[in-house]
């Protein structure tokens, strides 16, 4: 069974491109440090998961 695109966490740059809501719902594996370094939007939802 093939995975749909949104079943897999997207890279941070994809989340930024799609917008904040995408990051919340589709980018759960988004690495906070990596995102901050690259200047990407990181939702508070992700910050909590990363232990800030």
Curated annotation (Swiss-Prot):
Single GO MF annotation: ion channel regulator activity
Subcellular location: Secreted
Residues where Glutamine amide is found: 50
Keyword Secreted belongs to the record: yes
Gene Ontology CC entries for this record: extracellular region
Tissue: Expressed by the venom duct.
Keyword Secreted in record: yes
Propeptide residue range(s): 1-4
Predominant place of localization: secreted
UniProt keyword terms in alphabetical order: Amidation, Cleavage on pair of basic residues, Disulfide bond, Ion channel impairing toxin, Knottin, Neurotoxin, Secreted, Toxin
Cystines in this chain: 12-23, 15-27, 22-30
Function description: Probable neurotoxin with unknown target. Possibly targets ion channels.
Domain topic, free-text comment: The presence of a 'disulfide through disulfide knot' structurally defines this protein as a knottin.
Protein name: Conotoxin Cal6.3b
Source lineage: Eukaryota, Metazoa, Spiralia, Lophotrochozoa, Mollusca
